[in-house]
Amino acid sequence: MNQKKIFFSLSIIVSSLSLASITHGDVKSKFIMEIKGDNRCFISNGIPNHTTGDFPVRGNPNEITEQSIDVCVPRSPKRNKESTPIRGIVGIAMNGVLFRPSTAGYWDPTARRQHSRNGDRRWNVEIFGVRGQLGLDFNNAHVGRGGLYHYHGVPTGLIESNSKTLIGYAGDGFEIHYVEDLKTSGWELKSGERPSGPLEKYDGTYVEDYHYVGGGDRLDKCNGGIHNGNYSYFITNTFPFIPRCLYG
């Protein structure tokens, strides 16, 4: 099995730990976390420690492939005043699977599915707005072109095997938690119709169908808030599901 190399700067924690392995095809999941100086480092082959959907599948012709993931990030993240939008990988889960909420699809009226990689970049397809088209499995995950299995939403299989709310770390080093409905997203679907592009009612098909409203005890625009006295990010059951920006 070919092995893809992934090397990027992220941030995650826990002192040396190996998770229980399962076999996916002829490959077992491998995940190690360890502290190296001021960094928390992760080594993973990208194979999850839980059952996945069958791939390839309709809407997703890619097969899960062993990866080479080597991630190190700061142990003591600092929250900045301004956030940074993130396209691509946002963080890593406690089983070595990556969080990558965005899609590579954009509105394209000439395409059979009305979206393509070469479409209008003002309208980015939201994967949960086109359910059934991009092959999400029961873990809210699917497979990228390079064979990378990754999460787009609540990682069901991981949560079922994890007794703690901590399910991962973001690229800036802050923790990622899932607390079901105890934390509420500050994002809402816009009302009315889109003024350009796909001229229809805002329905969640595109990321741009949502806007940040906030208020009260809602999470900030990066799906962040306070957990046990510390700033953390949260996976939520509603948009944005996984943070689309980071404050670190």
Regions found by a protein language model. Give the residues of each.
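Short, recurring structural edge motifs at helix starts
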Residues: 134-141, 217-223
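Bacterial N-terminal signal peptides that target proteins for export
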Residues: 1-10
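Extracellular/lumenal glycan-associated surfaces
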Residues: 94-100, 145-158, 228-240
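Surface-exposed intrinsically disordered loops and tails
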Residues: 111-127, 186-213
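Short helix-loop boundary/capping segments
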Residues: 152-203
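Hydrophobic h-region of N-terminal signal peptides that target proteins for export
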Residues: 11-20
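Solvent-exposed N-terminal domain segments of exported/luminal and surface proteins
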Residues: 21-133
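Long, compositionally biased interface segments
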Residues: 198-248
